[in-house]
Amino acid sequence: MSFKYLTLLLATTSVNSFADVDLPSGDDWLNHVTNGLAPYWLMESAHGQPAGNFPTFRCDNGVILDPQKPCEELNKGWISPHFDREYTRMKSRQAYAYGVLFHLTGDKQALELAKKGAYYLIDHLQDEKNGGFVSFTRSGKPGMEWQQRTSQDQAYALVGLAMYYYLTQDPKVEQALIDQQAFIFKQYRRSDDRGLAWVLKDGDGESEKQQELVAQLDQINGYLLLTAPLLPEPAQAKWKQDLEWLTQVMLDNYHSDKEQRFYGAIHHKAVMMPDAKHNDFGHTIKAYWMTYLTGQLLENSNWTEFGFKGMKHTLKQAQYQQNFEQVKALFSPEWQSKWAQESIPAWQSRPYKHYSSSWEWAELDQAAMTVSLVDGSMKETLQYTLPTFMDVWVDHQYGGVGPKAQPTVS
């Protein structure tokens, strides 16, 4: 869920510094949002019962999942065992999406849905007995003991609240944010001070021995950076202090100066290997990006410089040249004609993989835009990768970026 800063970049990406490059215009971005993404999220089936209780599982055409007759795109071995779960993080992410839609277009229906989603999270998915938010429910009941919930789940429960607060400074949402952040940093802070724990008790396939990058990173990305500057004192000072501590933890424990990347986890040598989970360019670029933005917020020039250099190095490593003729079938006729016989820049998730997921592509694009707003160095790449995301990854029939989005592969 790192799209929040994209909304701040869009207003400036297509102006003076990029005037000599054929990048998407403001109208192109609005078309991407209103015609490419919004239809999937504004259809009635997305609103939930009651509105704000957004459904976790919907098919590509927007229909709510029937577990007895699942659509092909959801009938996968890694998804189907969890059809009985309603995930808090999914509801929060959807509330966030409505906030972004309003932020870019002024759509009042989207703002109302963002509010309903935020209020549903607060009113129904907080654990009033133990603190925090439930990770998922089954038949309306919490699915795990509170100590088995991941700190990442606790962070993502706040994504939608953070965006709605960014737009409105709603006092009810403000208090929920302050309470939840305090809960996370009290309960999950490791006794050795090496960051936030993943879980506090083994369960649901997770272990308290795990030390995960995203336990740290997604606090920063999910809510701290967006809302810390808006909070009243003393909460603002406390959040900035925790943000500073967490960023330093990430740099001290998860970054490899030798390999110039972030480890996805550090509890065993195997999880630090380049092909292990979360050891991809997406997580590394996001960690550098968050370090850069944190440096700006806290006026730490060392972090700003470190994050900027890290982004530039990672973007270079993540880019490869793709023969367009091999992938042109994925593109609309406009781009098939415009890029015929060319070799185009593309993003990959790991060295020499020539593959990327939609979220990895988006994060690399966002970092590339950030870099180019400073020195213009990525604009030649962005004139290809931005239209590729809009054209290849978006479902042009029903809207949204779904599980059947196709990567550019050789």
Please place each PLM-identified region on the residue numbering.
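Sec-dependent signal peptide recognition
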Residues: 1-8
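Short linear sequence elements within intrinsically disordered, low-complexity coil regions
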Residues: 8-10, 170
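N-terminal signal peptide c-region/cleavage motif recognized by signal peptidases
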Residues: 12-16
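Glycan-recognition and catalytic cores of secretory/periplasmic carbohydrate-active enzymes
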Residues: 18-410
